[in-house]
Amino acid sequence: WGYTGNGRSMKDIDFSLPIKNGPTDRGFNYYFGIPASLDISPYVYVENDEVTSIPDHVIEPQKKNLALLMHGGMAGADFKPEECFPNIIRHSLNYINEQKDSKKPFFLYLPITAPHTPILPSKEFQGKTSIGPYGDFVVMIDDMVRQIVKTLKKNKQLDNTIIVFASDNGCAGYIGVKDMEKKGHFPSYIYRGYKSDIYEGGHRIPLIVSWKGKYGKETNNSLVSLIDFYATFAQMLNHNLETEEAVDSYSMWSILSKKGTSARKDLVHEAGEGYLSLRTSQLKLVFYGGSGGFSYPVKPSDVAKFPPMQLFDIVKDPSEKENIIGDKRYENEVKEMKRAMKQYVENGRSTPGEKVSNDTKNSWNQVKIFMQEEEGI
């Protein structure tokens, strides 16, 4: 609706008008969901290109307890935050059931509101774990997966359905992590940092693929990213990508079909504050001295205490405890990684292909400065 950042308030919006440039304008036949994450207004359900109920009341902000974070704003008459996740699950199961007798393939993209803030496990899941509401909320996600698998199996569609389970980032460090760690649960496992940080705890995610008859209980350690699903689906469907399509996406169809490996050799990460890093299968070069997110060091005065760049051997040191940026044994690798990052920025892409323009105003001075120092330009 474009009410933020341009002087308009939400009260100026006519919610009865169709939504433009939404999912149904971007290739989806049907959509049911919410406009943003559950803590951000307007608090309405959107079905296709219309809200299901015109906002008629206000949900007050709740920012004292970050686990229950709500920024506050207008809400529809049929909208209750604690019912949102169950409603999305219900619509998803209905959609799967509607495809029961169809001979055509179907695609369901299910970006759930859990376990993002506010942490609101349904009553039947409260107290299911010993680590508090967040753990209960995660169990609720597990049950969602159970329901989807059960429905596919009931409809005799499980054997020819590919299920992908993933996350957009690591666990948020502000949702009661310290209390969970005291109880023996470590959301980031052995990895450093959390959501928004440049470190592994912010970027390593679960990526589980289920394909009946293709996989047993196996693990693949190839370097892949969620953005690789674009090129992967294109290859799977024999779709020829245009020059400016999927400029950072490498197909992992060879991995999923068990016919080979991905062509990806490195991967760019971005922290919440925009700082970049480049990783290979062994090394991770961070173009900044801090976390770039919420974890120490964050304040400029603290970041200044450390070298302006960070280098980690993520094979030998997956917890990123030792910054080896000054180790001469890695001088050549660091030079090559710097050159690669500069090339990606200049070419507007990290895949082979014609040079394209970047679709952002970010100049990535952090990268340019280090490259100037390296090459004397």
Please tell me what each predicted stretch does:
Residues 229, 291, 300-310, 314-377:
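Long, internal low-complexity/basic segments
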Residues 1-74, 173:
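Catalytic-site neighborhoods of secreted/periplasmic enzymes
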Residues 26-29, 101-108, 156-163, 204-205, ...:
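Loop/turn elements at helix/coil->beta-strand transitions in domains of secreted/extracellular proteins
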Residues 39, 146-155, 181-246, 250-261, ...:
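Substrate-binding rim/cap in mid-to-C-terminal beta-strand-loop elements of soluble/periplasmic
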Residues 9-19, 23-24, 118-121, 127-133, ...:
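Histidine-centered active-site microenvironments of extracellular/periplasmic hydrolases
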Residues 41-42, 46-52, 58, 92-137, ...:
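Active-site His/acidic residue clusters
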Residues 1-7, 34-38, 108-118, 165-172, ...:
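Short, solvent-exposed turn/loop segments enriched in Gly/Ser/Thr/Pro and often Arg
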Residues 8, 76-106:
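Catalytic-adjacent loop/helix segments of enzymes that bind and process anionic phosphate/sulfate esters
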